[in-house]
Amino acid sequence: VGSEMCIRDSHYVATERAHVHLADGYSDLASKALGYLGQLGGDEAVESFAAARSREIERRYAPIVRDAGSDPRVRAQALADALTQDGYAATVRDIGGGTLAVQLCQGHCPIQNVAGDFPQLCDAETLAFGKLLDVHVQRLSTLAGGGHVCTTHIPVGMPVIRPGARNVRRK
């Protein structure tokens, strides 16, 4: 369900064959290096690397997101535009009638092969997105995990309770 909205509304989504052609020779080396890091320092070393990557993502995109202002939708779009510049083919789509949330969809992932072996990298990216957007985001799918796109759910508003409305529970 999470990626279906993105698939229907995305500008471009790379096919599996395209991902192979877009991949570079560094993926295998990076996976082996992270595997070796894990052998030497255990899971903590890989987690430390992922945390450093999260901080790097925050540093790279913080000025762009900050300059976008305070509107969460505009901030999410600024992040998507910056990610697209870096090869992630990112888009933002309203869900739920455009009132409560958007989805950040990434149609390509330059580190997909490495992240398939080390999902901590996807977790680090998700953490960075939440910090950048200053909301609790939720990753719904990843290319590395077999999804058609990476999809991140971003709440952008709170439900409005109409005056006089009652919260009634039925038993």
Model-predicted regions and their roles:
Residues 141-171:
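Amphipathic alpha-helical interface segments
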Residues 8-43:
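Conserved segment of winged-helix/HTH DNA-binding domains
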Residues 13, 105, 153-155:
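Residue-level recognition of well-ordered beta-strand positions that form the cores
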Residues 39, 43-151:
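Mid-protein regulatory/catalytic core that forms ligand/cofactor-binding pockets
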Residues 1-7:
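Short, small-residue-biased leader/transition segments that mark boundaries at the very start
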Residues 3, 14, 139:
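Short beta-strand "wing" residues that participate in macromolecule-binding interfaces
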Residues 17-22, 111-113, 157-164:
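Short, charged/polar, Gly/Pro-enriched secondary-structure boundary elements
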Residues 27-29, 119-122, 164-171:
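Short intrinsically disordered coil segments
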